[in-house]
Amino acid sequence: MVSTILGAFRVADIRKKILFTAAILALYRLGTHIPAPGISASAVKAVSQQLSGNGIFGLLNLFSGGGLGRIAIFALGIMPYIRASIILQLLQVVVPSLEKLQKEGEVGQARITQYTRYLTVGLAFAQSIGYVFLFKSFQAQAGVTLIPNFTLAKVFLIVISLTAGTVLLMWMGELITQRGIGNGISLLIFASIVARIPNGVHAWWTNPDQVFRVIMPFIAVGVVAAIVFVQEGQRRIPIQYAKRVIGRRMTQGTQTYLPLRVNMAGVIPVIFAASVMAIPPTIGQLIGQNRNNFGTDLANFFSPQGWHYVLGESILIILFTYFYTAVTFNPVDQADNLKKYGGFIPGVRPGRPTAEFLDRILARLTFPGALFLAAIAALPTVLINQTSANFFFGGTSILIVIGVALDTMKQLEAQLMMRNYEGFLK
């Protein structure tokens, strides 16, 4: 891996892409320290310290890279864009017009991307309104005035600022994808989580439980190794191509394979589950600010440290893993493409039998992959409960960090291989 990075810096255009990506990420981290207008800067620190052990606050703050804790212009993070992308992907299955756009290639994808941007703005605006009242609810808990002169004009100013911050992040992510290395949106989430690692290390080192301090590094290494193993694991289906006549030449039949990953859905189900499970406690927090017992009970019931949250998140991860795998990989289309180009699976007839065969294999692979995602997402939460650690750094974060790191290294490797440089995969 080190040789890959060093080799990349020796190539001028790749070096420019890496530096451009690093510059955008640095600007993002800078934005998480710029407070939103209309917020009392002196009260922000008191609120952040008071609510450091609040489960929902810690979860939301993690994905904003600490921006929520500082109530910065990037307090929403990139999550509205993630939710909008997931919603559009779900709608492509049930809305015929969107499904048609998906099959129109680059032109259709550009239209879907534009719809995603519009939906992102709407979701960010709605979430900004909710966050303003969430900030107001924090005032009573922290005993400070976070938003002086709570007027309609002040609320509108904060909402517009937070929405604009999300739109700016969306643009920065697209810039990284177009002109940098890796997927821009994923790297922004990656940067948000990595920025919280020092706090996590400090929480581990200062934990009074000596046993926890000793075994935690071994657990972390084991979890990372397991994630890499499953993320890279695949079932290779042999594909045989018959002899074909191209022009006046007879081409020999070739043999290759179709890789089916154990975790075809990647980290999308985990992100989706985390974003959905954050809604009930947030609503409970908003309702409970007026001393409403139902709101308080709802927030406590779905607290990220509670078993109700772990169970609900695990169920959502398993269900959405199956659904997203079905969306991203269509056995019928794959079988038709193989038949069209003269390919077949040895021992399986082309056409419908091939589609049924691929569907069975995919179902067998998806089940353990979904269970693995749910287990990894739940394990750190269980450890936090057992050790009374107050830093929220769950399995969702670990999965995202490792997944994005692997994908980025693969893209960097591909850039090097295009230029005939020796890379990481030897």
Task: Describe these PLM feature segments.
Residues 1-102, 107-426:
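N-terminal cationic and glycine-rich segments that engage phosphates or anionic surfaces
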